[in-house]
Amino acid sequence: MKLSLSPPPYADTPVVVLISGLGGSGSYWLPQLAVLEQEYQVVCYDQRGTGNNPDTLAEDYSIAQMAAELHQALVAAGIEHYAVVGHALGALVGMQLALDYPASVTVLISVNGWLRINAHTRRCFQVRERLLYSGGAQAWVEAQPLFLYPADWMAARAPRLEAEDALALAHFQGKNNLLRRLNALKRADFSHHADRIRCPVQIICASDDLLVPSACSSELHAALPDSQKMVMPYGGHACNVTDPETFNALLLNGLASLLHHREAAL
């Protein structure tokens, strides 16, 4: 699997791995790259079956497989220890990595994540799946911003959204791959395993997230043995895109604090 690695800004730079959500594209993290690359070696990638890592995914594709293939690619790149920043599905992959490779994952940042899928989130995806079956890729792509962004943010950026729609259609991962990745997301359940995650965790959520209620992050916070929770009052599901200034400050402070906390505990 292809990875994109930024040059380390200094010797022994900590590595930060960015894992996007269901869309799978590493470019999702563009608003964070410039600030992160000043302090860390940053790993971005398109998830298997998407973008520049095309593949046909098995029907039983799982979050555990997503975690394993990423870890193997990191080891092949010479990376033994790394912090993880995961958004939604990416946060699930991050938790799986922390469970399966505890010696490798130093810190986890969960952005609008959850323990197991909430009934509201399941309802949102049910509607989106029906759009996919009835209207194809175009209907899926055109509806997607409604679940990602606040209404006023979208209303002020109509040309940008049209350009994003065209790009998403041009690079659509395919119906079968999308549904198999979505099914993996829906099957994931960390409610009985989260207490085994030993790395420090920062939870970031947006109170106005339409797709994943912020209560999901509260449940996650309560289940993890070593976590802190930060709530953004605005930004929607893609809060790192809509309010990068606020998000980046939380992310940078969280990474620095948790990495120091971990080093002090060793």
Swiss-Prot record:
One of its GO terms (biological process) is uracil catabolic process. The keyword Hydrolase applies. GO terms for molecular function: hydrolase activity, acting on carbon-nitrogen (but not peptide) bonds, in linear amides. Coiled coil: none annotated. It catalyses: carbamate + 2 H(+) = NH4(+) + CO2. Its EC number is 3.5.1.-. Pfam families: Abhydrolase_1. InterPro entries: AB_hydrolase_1, AB_hydrolase_fold, AB_hydrolase_sf, Pyrimidine_utilisation_RutD. The keyword Zinc does not apply. Involved in pyrimidine catabolism. May facilitate the hydrolysis of carbamate, a reaction that can also occur spontaneously. PANTHER family: MONOACYLGLYCEROL LIPASE (PTHR43798). This is Putative carbamate hydrolase RutD. It comes from Escherichia coli O26:H11 (strain 11368 / EHEC). The lineage of its organism: Bacteria, Pseudomonadati, Pseudomonadota, Gammaproteobacteria, Enterobacterales.
